[in-house]
C-alpha cells in the first residue's frame, strides 16, 4: 500500500466536521448577536444601520430645534418647533443640515427653511440660514411627503418645490471660515 507523505484521505474528515459544526453554531447565533435583526418592524435592517439612521434623525432634530431657538432669541419671536418635513445633510468641515421645518406661530403652522452648520468636536453650531417659506396646513405637508416627485396642484407644495429647485440650481453658501464655496 502506497501512502503519500502528509496526505491521507481520512485524516481531514474530523477537522472538516468540526469546522462545519463551528460554522453552523456561528450562523445560528448571528441573528441574536449584533448583526442582523430578523423580527418586528425593523425586520431587514442591520442594527448598525438602524442606529446610524436614528442618530442622523436625532442630529437633524437637534439642529432644527437649535435653529428655531436661535431665531426666537434674535428676533424676539415665539415660534414652536413642530416637525421636520424634509432633511438633507452635507458633510463639509462638520455637517451642514438643510432642513424644511414646520413650526407653529400663534397657533398657525408655517414652513421655514433652515441651514445649520454643526462641528461637534468643537461644540460649534451656527444657523447659516433661517427663512419663512410659506404657510402650512397639515394636509399639505402630508401630501408633499406622500407625493414626493409627483406633480401636484397644491400651491404650498408647488411653491416649496420651486424654492427647493431654485436653491439647488442657484444658491451657494459661503461660510466665512472656509476659503471655498460649498454649493447647497
Swiss-Prot record:
UniProt keywords, alphabetically: Plant defense, Protease inhibitor, Secreted, Signal, Thiol protease inhibitor
GO CC field: extracellular region
Subcellular location as annotated: Secreted
Key word Ion transport present: no
SMART domains recorded: CY
Limits of the Cystatin domain: 48-134
Keyword hit for Signal: yes
Molecular-function annotations in GO: cysteine-type endopeptidase inhibitor activity
CDD domains, sorted: CY
Any Pfam family the entry gives: SQAPI
Source taxon at top rank: Eukaryota
Reactive site (site feature) positions: 39
Signal sequence, renumbered to the chain: 1-35
Function: Specific inhibitor of cysteine proteinases. Probably involved in the regulation of endogenous processes and in defense against pests and pathogens.
Similarity remark: Belongs to the cystatin family. Phytocystatin subfamily.
UniProt-recorded name of the protein: Cysteine proteinase inhibitor 3
Organism encoding this protein: Oryza sativa subsp. japonica (Rice)
Taxonomic lineage: Eukaryota, Viridiplantae, Streptophyta, Embryophyta, Tracheophyta
